[in-house]
C-alpha cells in the first residue's frame, strides 16, 4: 500500500527529526520579544481588585468597572474620582438596592453618556444615566461582554447563546445574531467554550470579537450588521509552543465527560480609534497588529516595580496605553510605536 513508505525506519527517523527541529524553532521563536515595557506609573489608584474594564467617553471622562463591590467608578480627565455608579448597598445587601450592579463583567458608554453594564450576577444588561439612575434593563443569560452601537442597539456576548454575538434593540429585544463557534473539536460543548470571547468597537461602529480561549490568539472584525471581515491572528513561530500545549489540553478534555474548563489565552485586547490597529494582551505579552492584520511588534509588560503585569483590560489612547490587571490596578505605558 502507498502509505507503507511512512512505516520504514528511515521515514520514521525523518519524521521524528523534523518534529524535533520544528519544536526547536518554536522555542527559539518564543523568546523573540522586541522590547520590555515598564509602566511609567499607576493611575486611578483607588481601583485594583475586581477590575474588569476601562472606557473613555468623548469628553475625556473615564469609566472603570470593578466587581463585585465598586460598580462603575467615574473619573475626570485628570484622574479625580467623580462618582460610583451601581455600587451595592453594603448594609442592606444588593437585593434591596434595585440599581445595584451585582457582578458586572463589562461596560460601555453611548454618545449621550449612558452606561451599559453586562451584569452576570443579575443575568441582565443594565443601562444607567450619566448621573447613575437606572434607566432600564433587559434579561440576558450570563452576559460576559458588550459594545454599544448606534440607534440604541447594543451587541452582547454570552456563552449560553448559540451565536457569538447577539444584538439587542433599545426595547431589549433581539435584533440579529451573528458568528458561529469555531470547529476545533468533535464535541459541540468544547467548541462553544473555546469560542467564548469579548467585544470591542471602533469609531465606524464595527465590532471586534476576541476569542479568549482559542489556541492561536484571534480577534475577528465584524461590520455592524454581523458580516465577518479581517482576522487578526497570532500565528508566528513564537505562537506555536502555547498553541500546541492548548491543543493537547483540548484533546485531553475531549476524553472527559465533565464540562470543559480551559485557561484564558487572549486576556485582553483593544482597538486604536484613530487607525484601527489592534493590540492584544496574552497575560504579560503585548502584541501590536496594524489594521490589515499584520503583526508589527511584540512586547513584555511590567509594573514600575518590575512585577509581571498580567493584563485583563487595555485602553488605547493617542499618547499612551492604559493596561490593567486584577488585582494590581491600572498602569500608564508610553506607546512604544510612537517612540521613534
Task: Kindly label every feature range from the protein language model.
Residues 1-12:
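N-terminal secretory signal peptides that target proteins for export/translocation
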Residues 16-27:
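Bacterial N-terminal signal peptides
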Residues 8-10, 18, 44-45, 223:
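Sequence-pattern detector for short linear motifs
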Residues 29-340:
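Eukaryotic scaffold repeat domains enriched in small/polar residues
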Amino acid at each position: 500500500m502507498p502509505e507503507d513508505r511512512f512505516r520504514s525506519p528511515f521515514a520514521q527517523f525523518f519524521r521524528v527529526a523534523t518534529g524535533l527541529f520544528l519544536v526547536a524553532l518554536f522555542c527559539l521563536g518564543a523568546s523573540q520579544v522586541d522590547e520590555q515595557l515598564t509602566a511609567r506609573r499607576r493611575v486611578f489608584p483607588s481601583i485594583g481588585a475586581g477590575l474588569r474594564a476601562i472606557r473613555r467617553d468623548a469628553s475625556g471622562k473615564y469609566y472603570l468597572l470593578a466587581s463585585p463591590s465598586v460598580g462603575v467608578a467615574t473619573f475626570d480627565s485628570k484622574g479625580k474620582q467623580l462618582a460610583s455608579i451601581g455600587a451595592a448597598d453594603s448594609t442592606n445587601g444588593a437585593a434591596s438596592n434595585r440599581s445595584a450592579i451585582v457582578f458586572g463583567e463589562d461596560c460601555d458608554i453611548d454618545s449621550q453618556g449612558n452606561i451599559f453594564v453586562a451584569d452576570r450576577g443579575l443575568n441582565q444588561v443594565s443601562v444607567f444615566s450619566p448621573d447613575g439612575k437606572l434607566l432600564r434593563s433587559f434579561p440576558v443569560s450570563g452576559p460576559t461582554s458588550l459594545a454599544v452601537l448606534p440607534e440604541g442597539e447594543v451587541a452582547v456576548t454570552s456563552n449560553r447563546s448559540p451565536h457569538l454575538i447577539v444584538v439587542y434593540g433599545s426595547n431589549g429585544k433581539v435584533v440579529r445574531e451573528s458568528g458561529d463557534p469555531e470547529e476545533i473539536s468533535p464535541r459541540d460543548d468544547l467548541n462553544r467554550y473555546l469560542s467564548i470571547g469579548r467585544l470591542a468597537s471602533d469609531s465606524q461602529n464595527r465590532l471586534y470579537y476576541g476569542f479568549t480561549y482559542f489556541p492561536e490568539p484571534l480577534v475577528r472584525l465584524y461590520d455592524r450588521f454581523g458580516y465577518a471581515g479581517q482576522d487578526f491572528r497570532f500565528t508566528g513561530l513564537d505562537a506555536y509552543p502555547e498553541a500546541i500545549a492548548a491543543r493537547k489540553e483540548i484533546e485531553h478534555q475531549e476524553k472527559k465527560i465533565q464540562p470543559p474548563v480551559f485557561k484564558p489565552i487572549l486576556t485582553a485586547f483593544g482597538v486604536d480609534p484613530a487607525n484601527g490597529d489592534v493590540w492584544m494582551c496574552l497575560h504579560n505579552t503585548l502584541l501590536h497588529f496594524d489594521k490589515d492584520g499584520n503583526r508589527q511588534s511584540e512586547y513584555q509588560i511590567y509594573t514600575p516595580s518590575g512585577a509581571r503585569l498580567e493584563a485583563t483590560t487595555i485602553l488605547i489612547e493617542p499618547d499612551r496605553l492604559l493596561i490593567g490587571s486584577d488585582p494590581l490596578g491600572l498602569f500608564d505605558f508610553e506607546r512604544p510605536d510612537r517612540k521613534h
